[in-house]
Amino acid sequence: MVEGKFVASHPTAFVVTKLYTWMGAALAVRNSATGAAVMEVETVEVGYRKLRALVLLDAASHRPLLTVEEVGTNRKRWQAIRGGGASRSSRLFVAIDRTGFFETGVLLDVFLEGNSTVHPDYIVHGSYFKGTMTVSRGGGGEAVAQIGMEAGDKSSALSGEHTYRVNIGQDVDQALVLALTVIVDQRNNYDVETSSCSCNHSSRHASRSTGSHSNH
């Protein structure tokens, strides 16, 4: 769990929007019911290999909540770390891209920190291109969230602008599901330039080096 406030005793819904501004790509997360800003996403490059890191910021305080970093150079693996640090002790999960050249149903395997088995705690499955994806507990467990991509106009799609509607079940870590939504966007739209988020938060996290600590 990232923070207690991101676990609700009732189902919740969010809108994740990626737009391109003069500063580059900007991702924003809003509560579907109230329209209130929940998170903003800053994209930076990390280390000498220029790997991507996506920093999920609290919209009110601009405090880093979760940092999603690429691990390795094949764009197939990400790790999520609480806050803006790089300590393995703060890692929340590792996500591994399981698709080949064609979608086969399972998009991501997600291993929570402490899971040293080959069995994922969660999977993201469905079809990105059809705009319907589900987050389920691993091993054929129950669905905990739905990620849907809105069908926008052709000009928006060609420019890489997307809107996702995310429905999350009760007692599910919203920050984890929202981070997976950002990863799903990144794995299918690897065109985000290094930029500041829409709040003009500085890219001070870019000096960190990234390494793989996972057994997966």
Regions found by a protein language model. Give the residues of each.
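Low-complexity or membrane-interfacial segments used for flexible interactions
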Residues: 1-53, 59-64, 73-76, 83-216
